[in-house]
Amino acid sequence: MIEVVCNDRLGKKVRVKCNQEDTIGDLKKLIAAQTGTRWEKIVLKKWYTIFKNHVSLGDYEIHDGMNLELYYL
């Protein structure tokens, strides 16, 4: 079980607990449950890498305590 921190730079910082086998789409659904936005409208980035929904967190080497950038469409 890992904890990922997502910051949208607008004052909202979300901490989500998930597994490394979970996909980015699963992570977006957990974030959407906490923020109240639809998961389809969420974009997760790290630097210039936009994360795809079907790839797992382990494949992107997302570890415990990692910060991701949260954007809305």
Swiss-Prot record:
Keywords: Cytoplasm, Ubl conjugation pathway. One of its GO terms (cellular component) is nucleus. It is found in: Cytoplasm. Residues 1-73 form the Ubiquitin-like domain. The keyword Cytoplasm applies. SUPFAM superfamilies: Ubiquitin-like. GO terms for biological process: mRNA splicing, via spliceosome; protein modification process. GO terms for molecular function: protein tag activity. InterPro entries: Hub1/Ubl5, Ubiquitin-like_domsf. Its main location: cytoplasm. The keyword Cytoplasm applies. This is Ubiquitin-like protein 5.
